[in-house]
UniProtKB/Swiss-Prot annotation:
It comes from Nitrosococcus oceani (strain ATCC 19707 / BCRC 17464 / JCM 30415 / NCIMB 11848 / C-107). GO terms for biological process: cell division; protein import. Keywords: Cell cycle, Cell division, Periplasm, Signal. Disulfide bonds: none annotated. The Tol-Pal system is composed of five core proteins: the inner membrane proteins TolA, TolQ and TolR, the periplasmic protein TolB and the outer membrane protein Pal. They form a network linking the inner and outer membranes and the peptidoglycan layer. Part of the Tol-Pal system, which plays a role in outer membrane invagination during cell division and is important for maintaining outer membrane integrity. Its main location: periplasm. It is found in: Periplasm. One of its GO terms (cellular component) is periplasmic space. This is Tol-Pal system protein TolB.
Length: 434
């Protein structure tokens, strides 16, 4: 039997009820706890950067180390285990670092330039080849130090793995809190991928659902109930300007962007039944894509732009189907388990993250679209809203804990697990930026 709360959330009919869970209101950044999967990580030594002049407001080396640790690919050595603190390449005794088992070594310095500006230098060395792999210097204002640390972590990650890092990306999510007088407050927030620098995009006394990033990362589409009914908005993050793109009678929900950013796939019930539509954002033209008496919902646009995967109960239970954007017959994709929903494409288009339900439990799973192999990744029981990292290595999702709704992340091999919580608030509806 399908899970009523999850399925009602999918179709949008009972979205208000989904969010009626009390929680105290304390605004805070997301805190991230690595809960598993560091055993196979590559040891790397990140020496605290030397400070010259005034003390910088950010510990650049610590931010880099935390980024690399969260990736699950690297295990920064504890600071107390560092046998020395070389300031320059000539200070490095490579054999000492090899004895510690470190594969790489990062050194650097932060130089105060005055007028609230800093120069940051860093070098990455291969311990076994005894050579520099990369080195850079940057000048940034004090407020830009943390972002620069993320950039350096991206560069280190790419140099050592050959893959793009994700440390300068962002996450969108929705929090719900209870004010002192008992009223609920919903907030759509955007934060750095490590949970820092959160800022509020929208506050409302009514639920906010389904944030979706535009392909260029400059806009968010989302569903708001601020006018006491569902409505889909698109909002510019830089200016805060927004426009309503779907406010028809009935359900307006589940926006997802086309890869070129020119269209939105939506769920509308303006003709009586929840169906998938495509809205051209430039012309306003609306095209109905599905025609079925069942519930069709949760569209996910394929990265090549040619098809859309969606959830439908046309076979009796929620399963995933794929349909060409030009229209035609939908093909069923999932057959393993009684419930498969909430598809999210990997950036390469070869895999889907989804919610797999069986025997009353709902887990994050990955479906290989070529082999049709389904791999369940999580052991938590009430998972929702999977969203791939832009490099395809991690999946962000919402789940439940004894303290309420939290976010979590899992690597696509299931090895690395993280938990993201915000003190005092329910946290739901995650979306990872491009």
């Amino acid at each position: 039997m399908m899970n009523t709360r999850v399925w009602c959330k999918i179709i949008g009919m009972l979205a208000l009820l989904v969010w009626l869970v009390s929680s105290p209101s304390v605004f805070a950044v997301l805190t991230i706890e690595i809960t598993g999967g560091t055993e196979a990580a590559l040891p790397i030594a990140i020496v605290p950067f030397q400070n010259e002049g005034s003390t910088p407001p950010e510990n650049v080396a610590a931010v880099i180390a935390a980024d690399l640790a969260r990736s699950g690919r690297f295990a920064p050595l504890p600071e107390e285990d560092l046998i020395s603190r070389p300031r320059n390449a000539s200070d490095i005794q490579f054999q000492d670092w090899r004895r510690l088992g470190s594969e790489g070594l990062v050194i650097g310095k932060v130089i105060s330039l005055g007028a609230d500006r800093y120069e940051v230098r860093f070098q990455l060395f291969d311990i076994y080849k005894e050579e520099q792999l990369v080195g850079r210097r940057y000048q940034v204002p004090a407020a830009g130090l943390r972002h620069l640390a993320h950039q350096i972590a991206d560069l280190i990650y790419e140099t050592l793995t050959g893959e793009k890092g994700i440390f300068t990306t962002h996450i969108a999510f929705v929090t719900v809190s209870r004010a002192a007088h008992g009223a609920k407050q919903y907030s759509l927030q955007v934060a750095d991928v490590d949970g820092h620098n959160p800022h509020t995009i929208l506050r409302s006394k009514e639920p906010i659902l389904s944030p979706a990033w535009s392909p260029d990362g400059t806009q968010l589409a989302y569903v708001s109930f601020e006018r006491r009914r569902s409505e889909v908005f698109v909002q510019e993050l830089r200016t805060g300007q927004r426009q309503s793109v779907a406010s028809f009678s009935g359900i307006n929900s589940a926006p997802d962007w086309s890869p070129d950013g020119g269209k939105l796939a939506l769920v509308l019930s303006k003709e009586g039944n929840p169906e998938i539509y495509i809205r051209d954002l430039a012309t306003g033209r609306l095209t109905r894509l599905t025609h079925n008496t069942a519930i069709d919902t949760e569209p996910a646009w394929a990265p090549d732009g040619g098809s859309i995967v969606f959830t439908s109960d046309r076979g009796g239970r929620p399963q995933l189907y794929q349909i060409p954007v030009s229209g035609g017959r939908a093909q069923r994709l999932t057959f393993d388990g009684a419930y498969n929903a909430s598809a999210s494409f990997a950036p390469d288009g070869r895999r889907l993250a989804l919610i797999h339900g069986d025997k009353g439990q709902f887990h994050i799973a990955v479906l290989n679209l070529q082999s049709k192999e389904l791999q369940v990744l999580t052991e938590t029981r009430m998972d929702e809203s999977p969203s791939f990292a832009p490099n395809g290595r991690m999946i962000l999702y919402a789940t439940s804990s004894p303290q309420g709704g939290v976010l979590a992340a899992v690597s696509t091999d299931g090895r690395v697990r993280q938990r993201l919580a915000q003190q005092g608030d329910e946290v739901r509806e995650p979306a990872w930026s491009p």
